[in-house]
Amino acid sequence: PLLHLQKSALSRVKDWDRRVHLTPRVIQELEWWQSELQQWNGKSVIPQKHQHILTTDASGLGWGGWWHKVGSRQRKEDEARGFFSRRESKNSSNWRELTAVSLTLRAAAPHLRNQVLLIETDNLVTKAYINHLGGRKPVLSAIARDIWSTAHQFGIQPIAVHRPGKLNQRADKLSRWKQDSTDLQLRPDLFKKADRRWGPHSIDLFANRLNRQTRRYCSWRPDPHSVASDSLLFPLTGENA
């Protein structure tokens, strides 16, 4: 991404010896690299043999993905899926595919600490943006940085590869999942009335990233932003649910 920004600046001044003013976007990019390089200091830049695989896909409806340890049995609980909002669904297919990786990785990361992770995607642009830590389009580069930031937070080393669409059926099915009872929501106006009478409520026990009614929430399956999955096992001491 910095190389693309450099080329863009040089195309305007057409002189390698002239000073170039750093734009806010360039400064933001440099600050991100400074932070991330400190986290990766001393770690190998050569891809190591992966121990886990994470496979994702996206559709116009939603996103989905699953993960497993190499050579182990695939478990249904090791998968995540969700819907795109109406606004999100209008973005390009490349945006949706990269976002599918970002959201699935956030959901899976607590289970994949300190692992070399092979990320399988049927979108070549997604593969390139992850492996190159960005590209020409700022909006896609921002998602790629988010993927790497999540990976660094949990000590994960990601490597993206292309998986042909015809071999990506499980993730594709997850991305096209229709709503079920776990995706239902209490009418917001009724929740507000209940919150005024018995609140404030500290957590929504049955929600996802789009229909949550409190900042903190539990989801039925692994979710990129939930504090826990399976609310029946969540300790409620000190909570007002």
Residue locations for each model-derived region?
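C-terminal functional segments of enzyme domains
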Residues: 155-198
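Adenosine-cofactor binding site in Rossmann-like domains, unifying the SAM/SAH pocket
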Residues: 44, 84, 178, 195-240
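C-terminal reverse transcriptase regions that engage the nucleic-acid substrate
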Residues: 1-45, 165
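Two-metal-ion RNase H-like nuclease active-site motif
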Residues: 47-61, 204-209
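Short secondary-structure boundary/capping segments
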Residues: 132-139, 174-184, 220-222
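Short, basic/hydrophobic alpha-helical segments
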Residues: 99-118, 226-237
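A short, polar/acidic, helix/strand-boundary loop motif
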Residues: 70-99, 107, 124-139
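RNase H catalytic domain
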Residues: 105-173
